[in-house]
Regions:
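Catalytic center-proximal scaffold of phosphoryl-transfer enzymes
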Residues: 22, 127, 162-164, 169-538
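Short, flexible loop/hinge motifs at secondary-structure junctions
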Residues: 1-193, 234, 262-263, 397-398, ...
Length: 538
């Protein structure tokens, strides 16, 4: 049989097979569409069951809307027993929601439970200019606030007596009311339950002892105050910082008024709301050396030299600025005749230490000369020299060492590649040596920036505990609190005593003058509170 004959016999058989194939394809298409429809129905029913379960067993605080009975039409094709169970669950959920709605709202008015706290202090206030011959006591209004003393929380009751005319037919004296009550003392937080000592403790625990909110809340719970939340504590913190910001602005002006400051910067993680990740931002520190005032400054996390430049321009800073080798300072002030840059000998020394393994003779020579410079400083310290005497001694002994070091670097520096450790150390030191020699000009100037670095360390320690700031505003608030606490440390002021008093006073100083606020900064405040000055121990 030829090939053509075989094909002629097969062709009649192909047509029925093609028809069957087309029919099966149509069936598959219909079944696929039906399956997709059923899957969609299952998702809808699953969502409805989950919604009903949340109403019945979930948290009521989500305030979900009451179930619309019309939504149950989706269950029309279900088995009767399943539909009946869902309907019963719906009725039970609606009933429970209705019963608990009002009750829950009432309970939420004050979630913080203070019943276990003792009442240790009562302040009874009587109206001014009270004529007891005309008025009689008719009641009192009691305000309860939570105060703190180390190891204990307690209630302070502010009792305001209410007095009314003895005789209803009497007329109150001119300018007075028929019912008298003492005015409510101003509190740090309007209608808040947190007293000044509790608020100061929250600030101290967070930025002096580096304790995050959740640990504080656990501690306060152990002391008898239940139901505190991180959002509540953070709200108290923010309102307290708002009270302190006028003080912070005065402190900033006082620091920048000085003619000798040290500056440094450190990183602080700040949460980015868009990426939900903590970004590395920068916090600046400026320290007025002679006045021992400390300022932390946050400007959207920038490390650009423009930050410190704008700060100096705003307050018309004139004087010496001592800093590490960060190029941003030099860029910011190289054209400013009012700012004389002084660098840090410790940073120079560190670079030579790093070169010890590579080129010990060269590195040891540089380190030995730097050691001689510090021996001269120790000699001046031991002799208790005044700034003028120190300046004279430096010019007698230190200047020739500094000049010899510069000549040595000019001669030896060209022999080593900038890629070598010793080459890097010489380049780093030489490019900053003229600025470094300025410490010979004034006996007040220090050879290094160590004091500034010491102010940064508490920030570093805190970073390991509270981890990050929630946003830029939180970082600015941190700068406010840390500035006041650092200044307290520099003046040996008890920070708890200081904050207790200042937070109590600030509600009365919302319109205070610059000079009035200046008297509330730690270095001035301690003059009228000698009992709060801590004695240094050796």
């Amino acid at each position: 049989m030829t090939q053509e004959e075989m094909l002629s016999q097969i062709k009649p058989l192909l047509q029925p097979l093609q028809q069957v194939n087309a029919s099966q394809a149509e069936t598959i298409k219909k079944l696929t569409e039906q399956n997709e429809s059923l899957q969609s129905r299952i998702k809808e029913l699953t969502a409805q069951v989950a919604w009903l379960n949340r109403q019945l067993f979930g948290r009521k605080s989500e305030r979900l809307p009451i179930i619309n009975p019309g939504q149950l039409d989706l269950f029309a094709n279900m088995l009767p027993e399943n539909a009946r169970q869902i309907a019963e669950a719906r009725d039970e959920a609606v009933e429970k929601i209705a019963k608990t709605k009002g009750k829950n709202r009432q309970e939420r008015k004050n979630r913080i439970m203070m019943e276990d706290l003792p009442v240790l202090e009562q302040v009874i206030l009587t109206p001014d200019n009270l004529d007891r011959n005309l008025y009689k006591k008719i009641g009192q209004e009691v305000t309860r606030i939570v105060e703190h003393k180390p190891g204990q929380l307690y209630i302070k009751e502010i009792i305001r007596e209410k007095w009314g005319l003895k005789d209803n037919t009497s007329v109150a004296p001119k300018g007075m009311s028929g019912v008298l009550i003492a005015p409510m003392p101003l509190l740090p937080i309007y209608k808040g339950i947190a007293g000044p000592s509790l608020l100061s403790e929250i600030l101290l625990q967070k930025y002096e002892y580096h304790m995050p909110y959740y640990r504080q809340i656990k501690q306060y719970s152990h002391l008898g105050m239940k139901g505190l939340t991180e959002s509540t504590v953070d709200g108290w913190f923010k309102q307290t910082v708002e009270l302190l910001k006028p003080l912070y602005e005065v402190l900033k002006a006082e620091v920048m008024k000085a003619d000798y400051v040290q500056a440094d910067e450190t990183t602080t993680p700040v949460m980015n709301r868009e990426t939900h990740k903590a970004a590395k931002e920068y916090l600046w520190m400026v320290r007025a050396v002679m006045e021992r005032l400390v300022l932390f400054h946050y400007d959207q996390g920038s490390r650009a030299g423009a930050v410190i430049e704008s700060l100096a321009d705003r307050y018309n800073f004139k004087g010496y600025l001592q800093c590490d080798g960060f190029a941003g300072y030099e860029t910011a002030f190289k054209a400013n005749p009012n700012v004389r840059m002084v660098n840090c000998m410790v940073h120079i020394r560190r670079h030579f230490e790093q070169a010890l393994d590579e080129n010990r003779p060269m590195a040891e020579h540089a380190l030995g000369e730097i050691q001689h410079l510090y021996k001269i400083e120790h000699m001046c310290d031991d002799a208790g020299m005044s700034p003028d005497e120190r300046k004279a001694k430096r010019n007698e002994l230190s200047r020739h060492i500094m000049e010899a070091m510069k000549a040595w670097m000019e001669t030896e520096g060209v022999k080593y590649s900038d890629r070598s450790q010793i080459g890097k150390a010489i380049t780093y030191a030489y490019t900053r040596w003229d600025n470094m020699m300025r410490y010979l000009e004034d006996g007040r100037l220090l050879p290094d920036n160590n004091l500034a670095e010491n102010e940064i360390r508490p920030i570093t320690l805190g970073r390991k505990n509270y981890l990050f700031c929630g946003n830029h505003e939180a970082a600015r608030n941190m700068a406010v609190v840390c500035s006041l606490l650092a200044t307290c440390r520099n003046h040996d002021v008890n920070p708890r005593d200081y904050l207790n008093d200042i937070i109590s006073q600030m509600p009365y100083h919302t319109k205070a003058s610059y000079e009035e606020l200046l008297q509330l900064l730690p270095h001035k405040w301690k003059l009228t509170h000698p009992e709060s000055v801590m004695t240094k121990t050796t």
